[in-house]
Amino acid sequence: MNTEKRAVVLACVTLQFDCDRIIKIAKQIADDTDCDLRVLSVLEPTHDYTEAAWQIEYLNMVSKQFGADMTVLFDKNADRAAAEFAKKNNVVRIVTGLHDGGEESFLVGFNILLPEMPLTMVAKDNMVYSMDAVSYTHLRAHETDSYL
């Protein structure tokens, strides 16, 4: 019996209805790479989630339509929570919205915690940008080879 976990593409979404575009692209990537799809949203702890209920339900419904489970975590540090989730769930790529440019953004923090994790960003106009991790050792080897 094979007990090895399948590789996972992780769609990281916020509570916005238009995050369905992220789930859709993540599903395409998962299918193209023979991976499972998971969806994650990390919410800051609060006492009232009334405003978020519709968005959570909608994104969960979209996740189910694409054959994915959606996990909602409650943590003040979304980047740390997502990185820990990625490590525990055999995630091989994350798919998010575009980086907002701030040094304190989710993507900057996540990249510090898991710099080797390939990343795909989906803009609101559905343009897709991907970055694959390249190790420093690999870069140095190419640099050395090019000067021989």
Predicted segments with their positions:
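Glycine-rich, charge-decorated loop segments at or immediately adjacent to ligand/cofactor-binding or catalytic sites
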Residues: 127-136
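Small/aliphatic-rich secondary-structure junction motif
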Residues: 2-53, 63-64, 89
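Structural beta-alpha unit
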Residues: 66-94, 100-102, 109, 116, ...
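Conserved small/polar residues in nucleotide/adenosyl-binding loops
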Residues: 137-144
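Short, aromatic/basic amphipathic alpha-helical patches
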Residues: 53-62, 105-113
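Short, charged/polar "capping" segments at the starts of alpha-helices
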Residues: 46-52, 102-104, 129-130
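Aromatic/hydrophobic pocket-lining residues that form π-stacking "cages" and hydrophobic walls in ligand
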Residues: 26, 59, 82, 110, ...
